[in-house]
Amino acid sequence: MAHKKAGGSSRNGRDSESKRLGVKRYAGQEVISGNIIIRQRGTQFYPGANVGIGKDHTLFATAEGVVKFERKGPRQVRTVSVVSAA
């Protein structure tokens, strides 16, 4: 019997491409208008002063300055602001 039995097939072996989410500019870093600060799924962080939000919830600078992270309100909502570099 010079035959080899058929090898088993695997139903695994797939994965999606990483989306490169996360913080792109950290607290204290200088940014210019249009710089992406955070890429996220949903609103883990909310926009504060001088920060806009895209349709995919990306936070970006709308003015020149320094990135500032803070927690606001009774729910301790995480916000990101851009304050003028003093």
Swiss-Prot record:
Q: Which organism is it from?
A: Acidithiobacillus ferrooxidans (strain ATCC 23270 / DSM 14882 / CIP 104768 / NCIMB 8455)
Write out the GO cellular component annotations. cytosolic large ribosomal subunit
- Segments for region (Disordered): 1-22
Q: Per its record, what are the GO molecular function terms?
A: structural constituent of ribosome
Q: Which family does it belong to?
A: Belongs to the bacterial ribosomal protein bL27 family.
Which UniProt keywords are listed? Answer: Ribonucleoprotein, Ribosomal protein
* Protein's UniProt name: Large ribosomal subunit protein bL27
Q: Which gene encodes it?
A: rpmA
Tell me the PROSITE patterns matching this sequence.
RIBOSOMAL_L27 (PS00831)
Q: Which Gene Ontology BP annotations are present?
A: translation
Annotated Pfam families: Ribosomal_L27 (PF01016)
